[in-house]
Design a protein with these regions (language model features):
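N-terminal mitochondrial targeting presequences
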Residues: 16-19
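Alpha/beta enzyme core
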Residues: 25-33, 40-75, 79, 83-104, ...
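C-terminal helix-cap and adjacent tail motif
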Residues: 247, 251-253
Length: 283
């Protein structure tokens, strides 16, 4: 390094140092947002550039979701994605994020094979990525697994209500309305040590009651406005997803149309001989 840089480092050098030393949001700080009544924003990400953009935009949490099975791999549901594949995507996301809390889904059936196997799977996720926590689907029936993971030092976000990994048992993606069971699942997850609970596709009134009952943050997806935070699949939010989009999704952009238009324009210009033009050509 030139000696002059030690006294007057270039701007790019300062920026690289600062970006590499920013502290990530921690699990305790994430939990404190409920007490502070600070609404939590979360989105999914599956690759480096998307995760980097979401992090720079200031979301508090990023989930490497098993929805990668649907929106990236093209499967009909979340079941096919494997642990190795989740880790592959989580490693990219973990490398990109400097500020947000990064959570990784435990893919089916990694949390249904006993506590020891669950710890092995979740341990791999944390060891092989720069991510900080795992999410698993389940409430009361997963309490032992949640407690085992937490006891091993692995932060757990629980997921109750509609559980996409149980799509075949449920007979489809249906709103879950059993208030007693939903409340029991959320409280059991909290008691087992979960630091937050995702509430998916449940009536807003039930989500509100759960949010007021448990002390850890609730993250809603199709669960009304009174949850402590909200999460969406980023492909849905950006309007990239094709076909059916759930009712609870709001499209904040229409990138599917934008991308299609850009590619069509490129194709036409190549065929017409107008690309590359002089400004894209070396002399």
């Amino acid at each position: 390094m030139p000696r002059a840089w030690l006294l007057n480092p270039p701007v790019f050098c300062i920026q690289i140092h600062m970006s590499s030393t920013k502290s990530r949001l921690t699990v305790p700080k994430f939990q404190a947002m409920k007490v502070e009544e600070h609404k939590i924003t979360m989105l999914t990400a599956y690759d480096y550039p998307t995760a980097e953009l979401l992090d720079q935009a200031g979301v508090e949490g990023i989930l490497v979701g098993d929805t990668v099975s649907e929106v990236v791999q093209g499967h009909a549901n979340t079941l096919p994605v494997t642990l190795d594949e989740i880790i592959y995507h989580a490693e990219m996301v973990g490398r990109a994020v400097q500020q947000a809390l990064v959570v990784v889904d435990m893919p089916f059936p990694s949390n249904h094979l006993g506590v020891t196997r669950a710890i092995e799977s979740a341990g791999r996720i944390l060891k092989e990525t720069r991510c900080q926590a795992v999410k698993l689907e389940g409430g009361a029936e997963q309490a032992e697994v949640i407690a085992g993971l937490v006891g091993a030092g692995i932060p757990v976000m629980a997921h109750v209500g509609l559980r996409p990994q149980s799509v075949h048992r449920l007979g489809g993606y249906k709103v879950q309305r059993d208030e007693q069971q939903l409340l029991a699942d959320a409280t059991a997850a909290e008691a087992a040590g979960a630091f937050a609970v995702v509430l998916e596709c449940i009536p807003a009134s039930i989500a509100d009651k759960i949010t007021r009952t448990i002390e850890v943050p609730t993250i809603g997806i199709g669960a009304g406005v009174n949850c402590d935070g909200q999460i969406l699949v980023v492909n849905d939010l950006l309007g990239i997803s094709g076909g059916y989009v759930p009712r609870f999704v709001k499209k904040y952009a229409d990138l599917r149309t934008t991308i299609s238009g850009a590619v069509t324009q490129f194709r036409n210009e190549v065929r017409e001989g107008t690309f590359p033009a002089d400004e894209q050509t070396f002399k």
